[in-house]
Amino acid sequence: MCRLHGAWRQFAGRASRWRQGVVSLTRLEVVVDPPRHCALQPRRKVGDTAYNTPVDELDKIVEQLHSGAAQWAATSLQDRARLARQCAQNAVKVAEAITADAIAYKGCYDYVGDGEEMSAWSFTPSVLNDTARTLEALHSGKARFPSGVHKQGAHTLVRVFPTSALDHLLFSGYEGDLWLTPGSGPTPTAGGEVVVGGPGEVCVVLGAGNQAVVPVADVALKVLVHGCATVLAMNPVNEWAGPHLERTFEPLIKAGALRIVYGGIATGKALTAHPKVGCVHITGSDKTYDAIVWQGQPKRADAPPPYTKPVSAELGCVTPYVMVPGPWSDAEIDAKAAEVVATVAHNASCNCLAAKVLILGRNWDRKDAFLKALRQQFNSAQQRRCYYPGSANKYDAFVAAFPDAEALGQPATSQGADSFRPLPYLVLPPQAVSSTDKGCVDEAWSPVLAIRELDTPAGDTSAFLNAAKEAVNTSCWGTLSCSVFIHPATEAQNKAAFQQYLTDVRYGAIGVNTPSLFCFFVPSLSWGGYPGHTQDDIQSGVGQVHNTFCIDKVEKSVLRGPWSPPVTPFWSIRHGNMRQMSRAILAYFANPSLWSLTRLVVAAVQG
């Protein structure tokens, strides 16, 4: 692995010097539209009801989708794949425009520029193209099969990342596995999630408000994989992205498989209550789920809710990051502290995968050094403007509850989002982990990080892992994703204990030596709450998205990253080439090739 990284460093170094640091290979270029607003509708502003889809029009839309639902369900996998690839091409064309609109609303910060939004949007062609690959393989009669399958205890593990030869070069040192539910058998069913034929039904997707890419994956699953005619209701918070999604999904809209509508609570109520809607998918909060499923009635474990249609949901989480005590060097401490800060800063911390609880060993001899580095990293980062409605109120509640918390960060100097208030990074003082602690059970949805300690004997890694497992499983609210960082020497000395930790931790996605943020951006991994939540205690939700191999019976995903990445990760606030890097990522996912890989490697080493 080290020799491979070294070879790429040498190659990229030569390439970066070529033409004074500018790579000019026409086959690397991606043709994009200039930053402009989609002609389908004028640009929308949050809270502007002028463009809300009228309720009577919603009824017509559902009727139209329902009338063609059976025909769409019978659409061949080959045709679905073709449409998916067309949508992926459209996503590249609108990339500059949707990025420009995103930073106009959310803000553009000196150290990342527009690269954060562009790199997030690159997930769109990634998930669409990868879904197309699976559908094409199934159409040919050969299920697209992952890189390898092996057993770990009662679990079958399926290696789904990296898969292609190019991905192996680019992501050397990373390993992503789907963990199937115990008892599911030694052979996974590739394509088991794909539905073709049947009577067809209409699905309502209530889109996320924080990231424009989230409904893309929802649509890919419901329309392309499950074969549902779908109406996507844009969240009022990011309805500005709707016209760009309309253009991206124009092939599916023309095929009669998708419509995009606008509005707020009234729109959601009308759609979910429509008699010809067969199922619902939500990305949002548990409160939204409860409002739909329980309809204002008290939640009960011994009785079904009044809403009887199937509802899948990807909801929130108080995301824990566990730092396993070990012989971390100063440079390693600094790098891992930066990883934590990056996930808190990303998207103004309005992410269900943002680090919210940092779990350390109270007696770790490097604890104070880590906390010092963490403060330094926060203080070097610009504060973000709190664009999401209600986020500032949540933040203020934490300020009131923890008067000794530290407020850190550089003043915001963003372009755009001037009307929104910048929020300092709020670091809650260290204390013991507790299931009654606000820092562990209340999702802040703002730049808040709780420091929580486990009082285990110094040097007893097994005791720490057991305590950490208990803490994340029983004291932290939600089960969507988590991360754990462990020094290679520590893992080697405690291999069995760490494997048991990964087996027993009840989260839908687990990052090992990498933020769970990256788990989200690998479309072949699953994304969703850990199985087992009930309608009366939904927490992080039910059902999963992504999983572009369409393998059924998935319990969770585990993504391992290298302890010391050879280049600065693209999500890092310390990346010095974010603008070029994000566009190279987009180009690679739009058209994986040696040329686009070269461009990406050059951009990466310049970061």
Residue positions per predicted region:
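N-terminal chloroplast transit peptides
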Residues: 2-7
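Conserved NAD(P)+-binding/catalytic subdomain of aldehyde/semialdehyde dehydrogenases
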Residues: 202, 236, 251-362, 533-534, ...
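PLP-dependent aminotransferase-like
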Residues: 202, 214-266
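Short loop-to-beta-strand entry elements in the cores of soluble alpha/beta enzymes
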Residues: 76, 84, 226-237, 307-326, ...
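NAD(P)-dependent aldehyde/semialdehyde dehydrogenase
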Residues: 326-327, 346, 352, 360-481, ...
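N-terminal Rossmann-like NAD(P)+-binding subdomain of aldehyde/semialdehyde dehydrogenases
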Residues: 28, 33, 37-188, 221-222, ...
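C-terminal core of ALDH-fold dehydrogenases
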Residues: 82, 463-571
